[in-house]
Amino acid sequence: GIGAILKVLATGLPTLISWIKNKRKQ
């Protein structure tokens, strides 16, 4: 359901943002 999708986004978004920030540093 949509709840599971939102849960995945909530947990995955911080990781994705951190990854993007690390990519910009290099």
Curated annotation (Swiss-Prot):
Expressed by the venom gland. Its main location: secreted. The keyword Transport applies. The modification Glutamine amide is found at Q26. The record marks P14 as: Important for the flexibility at the center of the helix, flexibility that is important for the stability of the voltage-gated pore. Keywords: Amidation, Antimicrobial, Cytolysis, Formylation, Hemolysis, Ion transport, Membrane, Porin, Secreted, Target cell membrane, Target membrane, Toxin, Transmembrane, Transport. Transmembrane segments: none annotated. GO terms for biological process: killing of cells of another organism; monoatomic ion transport. Pfam families: Melittin. InterPro entries: Melittin/Api_allergen. The modification N-formylglycine is found at G1. GO terms for molecular function: porin activity; protein kinase inhibitor activity; toxin activity. It is found in: Secreted; Target cell membrane. One of its GO terms (cellular component) is other organism cell membrane. It comes from the Eukaryota. Main toxin of bee venom with strong hemolytic activity and antimicrobial activity. It has enhancing effects on bee venom phospholipase A2 activity. This amphipathic toxin binds to negatively charged membrane surface and forms pore by inserting into lipid bilayers inducing the leakage of ions and molecules and the enhancement of permeability that ultimately leads to cell lysis. It acts as a voltage-gated pore with higher selectivity for anions over cations. The ion conductance has been shown to be voltage-dependent. Monomer (in solution and for integration into membranes), homotetramer (in solution and potentially as a toroidal pore in membranes), and potenially homomultimer (as a toroidal pore in membranes). Belongs to the melittin family. This is Melittin.
